[in-house]
């Protein structure tokens, strides 16, 4: 929303899907909306899925604002993802040791949060971290399983771009329904650009060539992640 205004990105994706891939069901999702105005603007533009991230606020403020936004979304037939707990960013914690007890989603509090706000999905914190920040040695699978038992609703995992297959499969088994992947795609894109430009005396000045290779690198990451998550080949089941 900050970089492209939202409307341009939405129009681009919607046009591509409707004209080239009409057989593929696509959700256009707002990730980590930080306030009511951003969520409202995304829905007015046409986004059919939104997230409000109030995880940096006090619990009472997060609950109150999330509840207000959930009502706004549901009146318009839009699902809302909330977040409880704190998935740290690298810029917030650096390389320091983290007291993970301060960051985790509390299962009982999550049950109350979902009941009071009426959200449709919950992003959880069980030792995961954004931007390749230092993670907990192992995710708190027991905590994740307890959250899943109490809520029985879609649970979302942020900050797991670097997870290997074993951790991912176990998280799915314990209740995760969706992984948000960002930094792994960025790394693939930038790494590809670096390889085609650095030290290449005959480098092309056709930016389309370099961006095409970077796009291909991101595509490979997405394909591998989809296979790891068990998401490949499911168009017919969700269409």
PLM regions: where:
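Short, highly charged low-complexity linear segments
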Residues: 185-187, 212-213
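Alpha/beta enzyme core
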Residues: 7-23, 27, 32-151, 165-176, ...
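Intrinsically disordered, low-complexity regions
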Residues: 6-7, 200
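Thr-Gly-centered strand-to-loop micro-motif
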Residues: 157-159
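Extended, intrinsically disordered, low-complexity segments
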Residues: 195-239
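Membrane helical hairpin/interfacial module
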Residues: 1-2
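Active-site-adjacent substrate-binding region
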Residues: 154
